[in-house]
Amino acid sequence: MKITSTIPAVLLGLAPLSAAVSVSGSAEGFASGVTGGGDAEAQIPSDIDELKEWLTDDTPRVIVLDKEYDFTESEGTTSGTVCASWGTGSGCQKIIQDDCGDSPSSQATWYTAGTTGIDVASDKTILGDGDKGVIKGKGLRFRDGVSNIIVQNIEISDLNPEYVWGGDALYFDGSDLIWIDHVTTARTGRQHYTFGYETNTRITLSNNFINGETTYSTGCDGYTYWTFEMVGEADQITLQNNYIYMTAGRSPALSGGTLLHAVNNVWEKNNGHALEGGDAGARGIFEGNAWIGVSTIVGDYAGRLFNAPDSSSAGDCESALGRACEVNAVSDSGDLTAYTDTSFFSDFSGLTIAPATSATDAQSSVPNNAGMGKL
């Protein structure tokens, strides 16, 4: 009797292993409708080799990360010349580069794994279990036409943070229908998010914690400069409910032909500038956001921009979003210059638009709910 009564208990104990972790909610904004690995059985990779194999194969998968997967030393080290382009202090980043010009140069060694991300194949869901799912020392790449991918509730961190070109956390270059949600990125060698020149369509970045606090930075002060690089030819990106903390620039760098809807994000502690961008083809609507302790909200920017500066202009969003915009909020920051260009609003036609709450609501909720472990 003891044996037969124990078997069901064991089975009941094992059953939730794969079933307990599942996608929370659904994508809003441009990536609406993404399914990732769909109803594939959830599986936990045993080590970094199995994780990499599952991420890159052609099989639709739901991959659950229940521990730290440390790639740091997995590919050995590389040595070469680095340049002290921003100073020689202990907190200054150096750049991996052969020609240093007038900057001091030295030899250095870094971990090879961090410099190139794992190429994630189509139809994948990557989920963290609670606050345990960490990929350390290597990022993820979405390129060459991959589509239908969900990444939720994980951390990607520690990609040679001392060296520019040490590694991107998340890299997109020719991808479609991708949802990155409740992901924490920290201590990257270069960008937290890089969008390359090939077009990336139907992308939603939501509820993520971009932790810019770092030991090494271009300002030698612990604030990362390398945040979002958006240079795609015709990218479509929803930036929703993200907490962007301790940055100094590229927050984002909105360039190329990118179409951006930035809604209900919170920037806090930026000692440089948030928005920048050098291309006239870039377009962005910023609504319901909060900037707290941001020295300069808009730096050098060449594109078209609407930032809902007041309630009288918010109604202009109706033609782009199907509703009025939420007004942005600023505290302990530089001035929010009014940008009210509506000439690109028709470009939102046919896209799914993320909902918005007030900037006040975002300011109180986003910092406490963004990132891994906050589902």
Swiss-Prot record:
It catalyses: Eliminative cleavage of (1->4)-alpha-D-galacturonan methyl ester to give oligosaccharides with 4-deoxy-6-O-methyl-alpha-D-galact-4-enuronosyl groups at their non-reducing ends. It comes from the Eukaryota. One of its GO terms (biological process) is pectin catabolic process. GO terms for cellular component: extracellular region. It is found in: Secreted. Keywords: Carbohydrate metabolism, Cell wall biogenesis/degradation, Disulfide bond, Lyase, Polysaccharide degradation, Secreted, Signal. The keyword Phosphoprotein does not apply. The keyword Mitochondrion does not apply. The active site is at residue 250. Residues 1-20 form the signal peptide. It is an enzyme of class 4 (lyase). Its main location: secreted. Disulfide bonds join 83-100, 92-220, 317-325. GO terms for molecular function: pectate lyase activity; pectin lyase activity. Its EC number is 4.2.2.10. Belongs to the polysaccharide lyase 1 family. Pectinolytic enzymes consist of four classes of enzymes: pectin lyase, polygalacturonase, pectin methylesterase and rhamnogalacturonase. Among pectinolytic enzymes, pectin lyase is the most important in depolymerization of pectin, since it cleaves internal glycosidic bonds of highly methylated pectins. This is Probable pectin lyase C. It comes from Aspergillus oryzae (strain ATCC 42149 / RIB 40). The lineage of its organism: Eukaryota, Fungi, Dikarya, Ascomycota, Pezizomycotina. The gene is pelC.
